[in-house]
Amino acid sequence: MAESNKMKEMPVNKLMVQMGIPMILSMALQAVYNIVDSAFVGNMKAGSEAALNALTLVFPVQMLMVAVGIGTGVGTNALLARTLGQGNSKKAAKVAGNSLFLGVIIYVVCLLFGIFGVKAYISSQTVDTEVLEMGVSYLRICCVISFGIIFFSLFEKLLQATGRSLYSTIGQVVGAVVNIILDPILIYGIGPCPEMGVKGAAYATVIGQVASAVLLFIFHIKLNKEFEHGAKYMKPDGKIIKEIYAIGLPAIIAQALMSIMVYVMNLILKFNPSAQTAYGLFYKVQQFVLFLAFGLRDAITPIIAFAYGMRSKKRIQDGIKYGLIYTIVLMILGIAITEIFPGGFATLFNAGASREYFIGAMRVISISFLFAGINVAYQGIYQALDGGVESLVISLLRQLIIILPLAGVFSLFVRNGQIGVSLIWWAFPITEVIACLVGYVFLKRIRKNKVEVLR
């Protein structure tokens, strides 16, 4: 079945599985980058505790770079899918070209921050000179060579928008394999390579990202034949850029709020470096689980957006139904794994002094995965149906308005010695439940205003 016919005619439940599995694998592999780095760094012969703390502190900026790249890609994905659904190949070419122009701008900003801003950023979270030095070295490399992750994110969404998610997964697998192979070689110094420690982890990561980006660029040029390619389509078009970010900005803010949340949580936990490190390690495991929901969301959005462009009420309704069902199944699986094997993850990271804090965080925060996954699915549905404001509100509730004040208040009791650090972890499930209830109200309203009116 041709790609365009597949988006129009294949049963939505089968289409979502066919598109969703490669996207889920792609997102899971994206989370592997950070897990693998931490696992190898945690097993360094010397300085592993400081190195793990350093990776925890740099993680918010890594997330922010990914946020801007993926968010721009999400906007491109939905707009491109809708434009192709309307049969407008000329505009589709401009949408793709403008997304690449935006990628260049994003890289320049990351490059400047990598040169001038990383030391001040790391210094705000620690006074330990060893942690500071490691954090600056790692983050500077990731920022200066960030073009790999930025353009990978864009080409991934361009392929997904045309139903070719399998090829984006192939690119992700190649990058992950390159990263995993290079990590021990560059971190520990194997063969002719000198021992580089955390710098080696950074170089392994960015080389893997560049490999993925190059491969997806080739796939994009060779396979996306529904619209033309060329530098002329990169000429900035204010209207198209506005349309991209009308959809993508909420996704950027959602991802950026995750970065802000982790940064502020690092500040809240600054009184206990072991708990701070434990939270950073757990967050990488949490990302692995929630990226399953993000991957499925990236199938939900183009499927529903394409159906919305066709004005197909039934396919939109099926997209919502199966998107939520499949998300719930994935999140239950994630909860089971993290609740049953917390000790195994702690051993993988060689968590040391942070081990008990890490296991405690996993036991409590994992409860929130079900509601967090549903919230992610809601946001994918909103984005497909022009519900950018609703998506933004859910992000603000989950990452800022509820979680941070709640964790801050709970930390006061912990610092006063009235209760253990585990109280802070309970802020996460409480937040996700509240956001999920609000999200359900939004979903009912959007269905009434955008879907039920279709014939």
Q: What residue spans do the PLM features occupy?
A:
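N-terminal transmembrane alpha-helices
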Residues: 7-39, 43-47, 60-75, 79, ...
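Transmembrane alpha-helix boundary and packing residues in multipass membrane permease domains
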Residues: 23, 27, 39, 78, ...
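Helix-terminus/linker motif at the lipid-water interface of multi-pass membrane proteins
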Residues: 28, 32-53, 122-129, 185-196, ...
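Small-residue hotspots at the loop-to-helix junctions and early N-terminal turns
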Residues: 49-60, 135, 139, 202, ...
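Short runs within selected transmembrane alpha-helices of multi-pass transporters and secretion channels
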Residues: 73, 142-160, 168-176, 201-216, ...
